[in-house]
Amino acid sequence: MLQYQIDRIEHQVEEDRSQSGVFLIGPLERGQATTLGNALRRVLMGGLEGSAVTAIRIAGVNHEYATVPGVREDVLDILLNCKELSVNSRSPELEIGRLVVAGPAEVTAKDLQFSSQVEVVDGNRSIATVADGYSLELEVHVERGVGYRPVDRHSEDTSAIDLLQIDAVFMPVIRVNFTIDETAVAEGGSARERLRMEIVTDGSITPDDALAQSANYLIELFQPLATVTLVEEPGIEPEPSAEAQIPLEELNLSVRAYNCLKRAQVNSVSDLMGFSYEDLLEIKNFGSKSADEVIEALERIGISIPQSRTSA
C-alpha cells in the first residue's frame, strides 16, 4: 500500500468567521482518490456533530407570526436570524443564552450572555433592531446534535406556548468540493492520483479538525469489519426418509422376531437403522435366524445395516 501525505496548502478566515481550507492528499493508487473523496465528503456534510440554535423565547410573544413593539423585524425574521447564528457548545446539555437590550440599538449575537461552555463564533451577526423607548428581551436555546432536526410539533418541548421552536441545522461544514489530479510517475510505473479537497466550515470548527474527525469517524465505522467473526448456523437435520418411518408391523416379521424387537423398544424401521447385525444378535432370545429375517425384510425396502459395529 502506498504511503501518502496530507498537505494543507490554503487556509482563510472570512469576515463572518467562516473558515476554508484546501488539502492535497497523495500519491494514491488509481481509484483511491475517488474512494477517499466520496467517503470523506459524505461524513463532512452530514456525519459530524455540531451546535445549533433550537428554540428562542421573546418576552411578550407567544407565536411566530406576531410582531414585537418597537422592533423593526417581525418574529419570523428574528427566528431566521437566530437560526443562522454560528455557535460552538462544548456541553452535551441544553445551554441557554439571554439578552435584554434597550433601544435605540442594533442587537447582535455578542449581546447574548451564555455560560463559559458556549462560544458565539460571529458576534457581529445581526438579530434585531430596537427603536428608542423600547427594549427586547430574548432567550436562545443551544444544543449539540448531528445533521438536520426538524421541529416536532407533538413533542413535549413544544408545549410551552411562548417557546418558539426552530428547525435545527447542526452541520458545521458548509461546503466540500474535491477534484482528482493525475501525478507524474517514473517511466514504466503505474499511474498515481492526488486528491485535492476544499472544506468550508461555519467557524465553529476548523477545516483541519473537520477532516480529522471525518477520518476518525470512518475508522470507527470500518474497524469492526477487520475483526469480524463468522458464526456458523447450526446444521439442519435431514428429515427421515419415507422408508425409515415404516412401522415395525409392516415388515411382516415372524411373531418371535416381532416380539423380541418390541421388547427392545424397536418400533419402526428408523429404530432398526441404528443397529448392526451384531447388535441384533445381542437382543434377548434373538438368534441368527431372526436376525437374518430382519436383514431380508429391510433389503426388500432398499435399506441395509452394517454387519458389525466397527463397519457402521
From Swiss-Prot:
InterPro entries found in the cross-reference section: DNA-dir_RNA_pol_insert, DNA-dir_RNA_pol_RpoA/D/Rpb3, DNA-dir_RpoA, RBP11-like, RNAP_asu_C, RNApol_insert_sf
Swiss-Prot/TrEMBL catalytic activity: RNA(n) + a ribonucleoside 5'-triphosphate = RNA(n+1) + diphosphate
A single Gene Ontology CC term: cytoplasm
Region (Alpha C-terminal domain (alpha-CTD)): 246-312
One example of a Gene Ontology biological process annotation: DNA-templated transcription
Annotated spans, Alpha N-terminal domain (alpha-NTD): 1-229
Any one GO MF annotation of this record: protein dimerization activity
The entry's keywords: DNA-directed RNA polymerase, Nucleotidyltransferase, Transcription, Transferase
Comment on protein domains: The N-terminal domain is essential for RNAP assembly and basal transcription, whereas the C-terminal domain is involved in interaction with transcriptional regulators and with upstream promoter elements.
Oligomeric form and interacting partners: In cyanobacteria the RNAP catalytic core is composed of 2 alpha, 1 beta, 1 beta', 1 gamma and 1 omega subunit. When a sigma factor is associated with the core the holoenzyme is formed, which can initiate transcription.
Primary role: DNA-dependent RNA polymerase catalyzes the transcription of DNA into RNA using the four ribonucleoside triphosphates as substrates.
Cited NCBIfam families: PRK05182.2-2, PRK05182.2-5, rpoA
Protein name, UniProt field: DNA-directed RNA polymerase subunit alpha
Species this chain originates from: Parasynechococcus marenigrum (strain WH8102)
Lineage: Bacteria, Bacillati, Cyanobacteriota, Cyanophyceae, Synechococcales
